[in-house]
Amino acid sequence: MSLRKKLTHKIMPSPVDARHYEYSMLFSADDEPAKPSQRLIDLALESAKVASTTSLDDIAARTLPENYLDVWPGEHYKLLAGIVQVLKPKLVIEIGTAKGLSSLSMKKFLAQDAMIVTYDIISWKDYPNGNYLTEADFKDGRLIQYTDDLSSVDIFRKHSDLLSKADLIFADAAKDGMQEQLFINNFKQLKFANSPIVVFDDIRLWNMLKIWRDLDLPKLDITSFGHWSGTGLVDWK
């Protein structure tokens, strides 16, 4: 924990007991630089409804006894699965493979002719503290991982043909106050074949507040139906 974080915790201790807490800030809505599109509102409502009846029991079984996959609302896995069922994307791009639970949650509900391409700077096989993915998850060719950093302009260009075909993008990366902004800058230079939906994780974390607030595209905070640390939808036009 950084010195700044330690001091903040000491000066402003949490008013409640919780397993995990983060500091954030609230902002007025009337001067928000971007408003949600009707497409986002419809997608959010339909996806939340589908998420409420979605089962991820088979994937959750991989995580036992540490099962938080079924925590909904509160975690975003069922919401991501709901979005896939409603949107029916042909190509999903994930930025930040991590332990693979988001990939698995989305892949379960993809059409047979659809696929997920997930990016991380670390191979899933080498991810610290293990991974929930197995070789079998990649066998049908509908899940592919590239160990590349899409915040790099040169690497982004290398994958631009593939990225331009995305229907759904899920960004769950460093949240360091810089990387997600670099993703946004790179995506703004790309001509998408469709208008993808972009899902940003952790938008209420301190380092993500300015990035989310400054994003000048149709957007919607759906944290109540997603991740407790923040989930945002963007209608990338």
List PLM regions with ranges:
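S-adenosylmethionine/decaboxylated-SAM
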Residues: 66-71, 77-237
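Membrane-proximal basic amphipathic "stem/tether" segments
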Residues: 1-52, 57
